[in-house]
């Protein structure tokens, strides 16, 4: 069965993407990091679409498959807090006072 971009665009869940590309994955890793994997995957897809606008649909799907593998691999070795993909991990809490701010001059 040949996969198409139209089929790809209908996918919603992380597991659907892995099955579509016939990639092995650990369900525990995906369950814990689902949103982060999909966010990273989305960023990588955007880069592919921007950098390679004229590649064939088949090559685009190949690149997307590599992007999903890459997004998944990131979270095998690091945490969402380390990756800081979402705003909540980027913003410094406003109600925190550092020790250097407490020291007297």
Swiss-Prot record:
The keyword ATP-binding does not apply. May protect the nitrogenase Fe-Mo protein from oxidative damage. It holds the Pfam family NifW. It comes from the Bacteria. Homotrimer; associates with NifD. Belongs to the NifW family. This is Nitrogenase-stabilizing/protective protein NifW. The gene is nifW. Keywords: Nitrogen fixation. GO terms for biological process: nitrogen fixation.
């Amino acid at each position: 069965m040949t996969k198409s971009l139209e089929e790809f665009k209908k996918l919603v869940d992380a597991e659907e993407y892995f099955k579509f590309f016939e990639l092995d994955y650990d369900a525990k890793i995906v369950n814990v990091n689902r949103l982060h994997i999909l966010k990273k995957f989305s960023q990588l897809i955007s880069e592919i679409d921007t950098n390679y606008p004229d590649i064939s649909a088949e090559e685009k799907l190949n690149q997307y498959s590599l992007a999903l593998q890459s997004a998944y691999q990131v979270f095998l070795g690091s945490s969402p807090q380390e990756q800081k993909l979402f705003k909540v991990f980027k913003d410094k809490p406003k109600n925190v006072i550092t020790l250097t701010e407490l020291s007297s001059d």
